[in-house]
Curated annotation (Swiss-Prot):
Residues 22-114 form the Ig-like domain. It is found in: Cell membrane. One of its GO terms (cellular component) is plasma membrane. This is T cell receptor beta variable 9. Alpha-beta TR is a heterodimer composed of an alpha and beta chain; disulfide-linked. The alpha-beta TR is associated with the transmembrane signaling CD3 coreceptor proteins to form the TR-CD3 (TcR or TCR). The assembly of alpha-beta TR heterodimers with CD3 occurs in the endoplasmic reticulum where a single alpha-beta TR heterodimer associates with one CD3D-CD3E heterodimer, one CD3G-CD3E heterodimer and one CD247 homodimer forming a stable octameric structure. CD3D-CD3E and CD3G-CD3E heterodimers preferentially associate with TR alpha and TR beta chains, respectively. V region of the variable domain of T cell receptor (TR) beta chain that participates in the antigen recognition. Alpha-beta T cell receptors are antigen specific receptors which are essential to the immune response and are present on the cell surface of T lymphocytes. Recognize peptide-major histocompatibility (MH) (pMH) complexes that are displayed by antigen presenting cells (APC), a prerequisite for efficient T cell adaptive immunity against pathogens. GO terms for biological process: adaptive immune response; cell surface receptor signaling pathway. It comes from Homo sapiens.
Length: 114
């Protein structure tokens, strides 16, 4: 019985082009098997206190997941219970995706602002 592969691709929302946004998202690309857990990390540009996470599945628009400001959750969108996020004292944020399913294949974006 083969493993079905799940493709979770992570790109930086503002850093995809030649302009240096200062936002760093890692990993940039990720392929993993269903059932696994992955962590996506976002380091905002210097001075930015807000971090936003978005998901874009195939043939769908950008879906807001969650917003943090200065370490506190400020707004929650359509985020699955299997997904969680947090913002740390140094203001970087992590999006944790657990028990991955084929339907979780998407682009995951982070953005930051003052």
């Amino acid at each position: 019985m083969g493993f079905r592969l799940l493709c979770c691709v992570a790109f930086c929302l503002l850093g995809a082009g030649p302009v240096d946004s200062g936002v760093t998202q890692t990993p940039k690309h990720l392929i993993t098997a269903t059932g696994q857990r992955v962590t996506l990390r976002c380091s905002p540009r210097s001075g930015d206190l807000s971090v936003y996470w978005y998901q874009q599945s195939l043939d769908q628009g950008l879906q807001f997941l969650i917003h943090y400001y200065n370490g506190e959750e400020r707004a929650k969108g359509n985020i699955l219970e299997r997904f969680s996020a947090q913002q740390f004292p140094d203001l970087h944020s992590e999006l944790n995706l657990s028990s991955l399913e084929l339907g979780d294949s998407a682009l995951y974006f982070c953005a930051s602002s003052v």
